[in-house]
Amino acid sequence: MDLIWELPRIVKKGRERAEKILNKDYEDPIIQQMIILSDTRNRQDILTEEWINQLYSGDNLIIIEKLLKLGYREKFDLIYIDPPFLTNANYKGRIVIKTNNTKETLEYLAYRDTWEKGFIGYLEMIYIRLFLLKELLSPKGTIYVHLDYRTVHYVKILMDEIFGRENFLNEVIWAYKSGGTSNRYFSRKHDNILVYSKTKDYIFNPQLEKSYNRGLKPYRLKGVEEFQDDIGWYTLVKLKDVWQIDMVGRTSRERVGYDTQKPEKLLERIILTSSDEGSLIGDFFAGSGTTGVIAEKYDRKWIMVDKGGLSLTTINKRLIENQSQSY
């Protein structure tokens, strides 16, 4: 059946399921919540803290429901999600085993990005989650949904319906150099990030970026502050909606070996723009855990969720090495 005819059914079915979840009596499911201590913390510290960051293992739909029932409705100032891209691919993890003087690399399935009902199944999955995530957003909250060319145009239609077209703020283009080339179409070198607020009274702290002068020479205009680096002279201007940020390369310092790891600079821009110190930030497709790392760096609280074994192992290792707060 044509997708255009399926969209109303997806919306109707998703809304009915979401409202059923919101209205039913809550039965606390068995969910694994991890509390792991960094080398600098002890369990007694946890007992005296007012807030403990939370990392959940399991289906994010179940955990979103749990958070709503536990009083987190309208508590999140920022939600960032990086859901699957409908690539119809399976992603692998790798373990290096050292024995004597040899190394052996073992591969295993990290997660699947395949859907039993194809595109329809994907949109059904994302709709109900977006509907319930809106309930978690505070009145000053913003949601960033990280997608690419495969799904962004369809998900925007769903988000217009859920959040209202009037609350659409931006489609941020994350442009990068990495990736393949083609002789059959233009090389695909960007992702799309849809940004919606819950109300008109949302947090927005404008960030600055470098804007290089023509010819890289100083303008020496009155009242304009100029700076110089190895490239040339520049001024600082408010951030635009095209972000030139390199992917996490194979030799990058921050690389943790997770295929779809997002760069810290990307999350830094999002978190500093759309949250304040003390804000609660959520990531319900946590992946490599970059959201939590950057949230903590800038004194934000976080809750992250993922069901992948590789994701949870990666996040635990990363946060422990980062000497993170208890979670």
Q: Where are each of the predicted segments found?
A:
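DnaQ-like (DEDDh/DEDDy) 3′-5′ exonuclease domain used for proofreading
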Residues: M1-L132, K140, Y144, R150, ...
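Conserved S-adenosyl-L-methionine
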Residues: L3, P263-Y327
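Glycine-rich helix-loop-beta junction characteristic of Rossmann-like nucleotide cofactor-binding loops
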Residues: K69-Y72, E135-L136, I270-D276
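Local beta-strand N-terminus motif with an aromatic residue
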Residues: K75-D77, F168, G278
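Short glycine-dipeptide loop
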Residues: L132, L137-I143, E277-G278, Y298
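Conserved Class I S-adenosyl-L-methionine
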Residues: H153-W174
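Flexible, glycine-/basic-rich loop-and-beta segments that form/coincide
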Residues: Y176-V248, S252
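Conserved SAM-binding loop and adjacent beta-strand
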Residues: S252-L266
